[in-house]
UniProtKB/Swiss-Prot annotation:
Residues 59-196 form the MPN domain. The gene is CSN5A. Disruption phenotype: Short hypocotyl and open cotyledons in dark-grown seedling, accumulation of anthocyanin and expression of light-induced genes in the dark resulting from an impaired cullin deneddylation. Severe developmental defects resulting in dwarf stature and loss of apical dominance. Csn5a and csn5b double mutants are lethal at the seedling stage. It comes from Arabidopsis thaliana. One of its GO terms (cellular component) is cytoplasm. This is COP9 signalosome complex subunit 5a.
Length: 357
């Protein structure tokens, strides 16, 4: 029973995050893990990304690396964490095959790597090569607990510095709080543009919910980087390691509830939504009664998408709560209905008491 429940939980996680096995599903599929030193050196010499800021368009992440990053991010709670990713490049795709955590000091809004973290980084990379893992560091990951996957001003500066000296380099952001609330991994992969690079004003990034106290930081820097498409894969080499990791953590999938574990996060979302509504109402009132008519008309047109975004945020909160309730109902039916049915059957099989006049 335990083995089947573990397998079902892991299969559900793989389906929700669209983790696909490498085809064909035999030892030949593990060729993706083969590191060709000559081809990687050739790419480093050619540097195709130097002439095209949007050269890299896709990220291919192994299921093992994804699970390690999510577990690490979740272990930090409301404190930001940081780690590095190892892999290689293949055309316009960055392939992430493994990840490791860094000993860093984090807060609820930023994470800082000190000298001991850099020493650990160098030592880990050297030891990996001695163990036969020739992949280089291809990026860094960190968490944004509860406020979405995007790059802050500090993140943009860090990524620009890394791209200047360690190309090819990738930035991945994971939101562990929204991951628990939504039921699938909330993740984003980004690369920054060179300093001074201009993009068109009609460039629109995918909409996501940003807390009111983070909107300014998001808006100032949102045109300094672009996002990459993320896909996941697993091979026969991953299967055993995934089993070992999953056997340790799968019980949490069934025993935890986003409604209980994320209560503070949901309360914060509702409070943030109320502040956004008050702000929109204030701006709408000013546009109606303040200034001359054309200016007021222009501001009113700008308010419409803001209200639409607030509606989206409200719908997102509602859907996540409904999903949480549905999962609780399903678990109740799965684990309690059989016990209740057995109890009812036992009660009906008891002999009826004799009635004497």
């Amino acid at each position: 029973m335990e083995g089947s429940s573990s397998a079902i939980a892991r299969k559900t996680w793989e389906l929700e995050n669209n983790i696909l096995p490498v085809e064909p599903t035999d030892s030949a599929s593990d060729s993706i893990f083969h590191y060709d030193d000559a081809s990687q050196a050739k790419i480093q010499q050619e540097k195709p990304w130097a002439s095209d800021p949007n050269y890299f368009k896709r990220v291919h992440i192994s299921a093992l690396a994804l699970l390690k990053m999510v577990v690490h991010a979740r272990s930090g709670g409301t404190i930001e964490i940081m780690g590095l990713m190892q892999g290689k490049t293949e055309g316009d795709t960055i392939i992430v095959m493994d990840a490791f955590a860094l000993p860093v000091e984090g807060t609820e809004t930023r994470v800082n790597a000190q000298s001991d973290a850099y020493e650990y980084m160098v030592e880990y990379s050297q030891t990996s090569k001695l163990a036969g893992r020739l992949e280089n560091v291809v990026g860094w990951y960190h968490s944004h607990p509860g406020y979405g996957c995007w790059l802050s001003g500090i993140d943009v500066s860090t990524q620009m510095l890394n791209q200047q000296y360690q190309e090819p380099f990738l930035a991945v952001v994971i939101d562990p709080t929204r991951t628990v609330s939504a039921g699938k991994v909330e993740i984003g992969a980004f690369r920054t543009y060179p300093e001074g690079h201009k993009i068109s004003d009609d460039h629109v990034s995918e909409y996501q919910t940003i807390p009111l106290n983070k909107i300014e930081d998001f808006g100032v820097h949102c045109k300094q980087y672009y996002s990459l498409d993320i896909t996941y894969f697993k091979s026969s080499l991953d299967s055993h390691l995934l089993d070992l990791l999953w056997n340790k953590y799968w019980v949490n999938t069934l025993s935890s509830s986003p409604l209980l574990g994320n209560g503070d996060y949901v309360a914060g979302q509702i409070s943030d939504l109320a502040e956004k509504l008050e702000q929109a109402e204030s701006q709408l009132a000013n546009s109606r009664y303040g200034g001359i008519a054309p200016a007021g008309h222009q501001r009113r047109k700008e308010d419409e998408p803001q209200l639409a975004k607030i509606t989206r945020d409200s719908a997102k909160i509602t859907v996540e709560q409904v999903h949480g309730l549905m999962s609780q109902v399903i678990k109740d039916i799965l684990f309690n209905s059989a016990r209740q049915s057995k109890k009812s059957a036992d009660d009906s099989s008891d002999p009826e008491p004799m009635i004497t006049s």
